[in-house]
C-alpha cells in the first residue's frame, strides 16, 4: 500500500522531489518542465519509506522518453534521492489536456500555439483544430505541415501577421 501525492498536497521529501522535477526541462520543449507538461503522474512513498516517481510518456515512441528518464534520475541523484524508483505509467495515457495553465502560457510566450480544444471535442472529429497565432492572437491561421519541428507539433502560418509558428497538437 502507498499514498499518491499530488504537488499541491505534498510535504516532506515528496514536496522536495516535486520541486526537483519542476526544474527538469522537457528536451523537445525546454521552455516547459516535465511537471508543466503533466507527465509526472505521482510521487509516493511506500510502507518501507522508499519513494516512487511515476512518469507517463507523451506518446508511444516519443524520442524524448529515455532522455527524460535520464534527466529525472540525475535530478533525483543530485537531490539525494538515488534510491527513488522510477515507474513508467501507461494508463491512463498522457493527453495534452494535462498541460498546466502555466505550460500553456509559457508555450504562447515562446511562440508555440498550445492546444485550445478538448481532445475528445466532437468538432475535432470533422474539422481542423482552431489555432490562435501566438504572436498576434488572430484565429486566421492555416496549417502548412502536419509535422513541425518535433512530431508532437504541426507547422502553421498566420494570415494576419504572416508569421510561421508551431502548434502543439492535441494528443
Where are these regions (language model features)?
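A short amphipathic beta-strand at an alpha->beta junction
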Residues: 1, 74-97
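N-terminal presequence-like segments and adjacent domain-start helices
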Residues: 1-23
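Generic non-transmembrane alpha-helical segments
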Residues: 16, 20-24, 28, 71, ...
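Residue-level signature of catalytic and energy-coupling elements of molecular machines
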Residues: 21, 40, 62, 84
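Short secondary-structure junctions
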Residues: 24-36, 79-82, 135-140
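Short edge beta-strands and adjacent turn/loop segments
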Residues: 31-56
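Short, non-transmembrane amphipathic alpha-helical segments
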Residues: 59-83
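Cys/His-clustered metal-coordination modules, chiefly Zn-binding fingers
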Residues: 105-171
Amino acid at each position: 500500500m502507498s499514498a499518491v501525492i499530488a504537488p499541491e498536497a505534498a510535504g516532506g521529501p515528496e514536496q522536495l522531489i516535486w520541486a526537483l522535477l519542476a526544474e527538469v526541462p522537457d528536451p523537445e520543449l525546454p521552455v516547459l518542465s516535465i511537471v508543466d507538461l503533466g507527465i509526472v503522474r505521482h510521487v509516493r512513498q511506500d510502507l518501507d519509506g522508499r519513494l516512487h516517481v511515476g512518469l507517463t510518456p507523451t506518446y508511444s515512441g516519443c524520442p524524448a522518453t529515455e532522455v527524460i528518464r535520464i534527466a529525472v534520475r540525475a535530478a533525483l541523484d543530485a537531490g539525494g534521492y538515488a534510491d527513488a524508483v522510477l515507474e513508467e505509467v501507461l494508463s491512463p495515457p498522457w493527453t495534452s489536456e494535462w498541460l498546466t495553465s502555466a505550460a500553456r502560457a509559457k508555450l504562447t510566450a515562446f511562440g508555440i500555439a498550445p492546444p485550445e480544444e478538448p481532445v475528445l471535442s466532437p468538432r475535432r472529429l470533422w474539422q481542423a483544430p482552431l489555432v490562435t497565432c501566438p504572436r498576434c492572437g488572430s484565429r486566421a491561421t492555416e496549417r502548412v505541415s502536419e509535422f513541425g519541428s518535433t512530431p508532437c507539433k504541426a507547422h502553421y502560418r498566420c494570415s494576419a501577421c504572416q508569421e510561421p509558428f508551431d502548434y502543439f497538437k492535441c494528443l
